[in-house]
């Protein structure tokens, strides 16, 4: 299993790494002023032998985080990540406000076949889930990834299960798991 955090906050893999932050790819490139030569320069094995990678983002106020994701994905191809590790599953933790095409790269660049949307019943989580579902829908006619289902991440919100069930039903998705 590989988990790639695609959020400038670079906090996707922290729990898998025992609370230790992972140096994001964009930070590596900015600080070293070159691309890494080896996957080991930007990846670390975490809990359950999950290989962890974080894209990170640009210097605040400069650059485009979406372009950083695209650059990271190209780098991972150049470093032959998928050929080397031959993962059964790759998890892309994408930013919920998929307003930028770069953030949708895992969905539209043939990196993903199935999209699992993890959401709670919180208003902003459902908003982000809706954005992700719309991003996937925008690429439906191109045979890119499709939504496989919803994973309900319980946060003890009032009427949470009902809210997420309604959200899923309105969009024609199944709730395939609960946390």
Annotate the PLM regions:
Residues 6, 66-70, 126, 130:
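Electropositive phosphate-/nucleotide-binding environments in soluble metabolic enzymes
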Residues 57-67, 123-124:
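Flexible beta-alpha connector loops of hexameric P-loop NTPases
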Residues 2-55:
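N-terminal phosphate/diphosphate-binding loop that engages ATP/GTP or pyrophosphate donors
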Residues 12, 53, 72, 93, ...:
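Residue-level signature of catalytic and energy-coupling elements of molecular machines
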Residues 8-10, 57, 96, 156:
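Short, glycine/acidic-enriched loop or turn micro-motifs at the edges of active sites
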Residues 78-89, 94-178:
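Conserved catalytic-core segment of NTP-binding enzymes
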Residues 54-57, 119:
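Flexible glycine-/small-residue-rich
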Residues 69-78:
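Conserved helicase/translocase P-loop NTPase motor core
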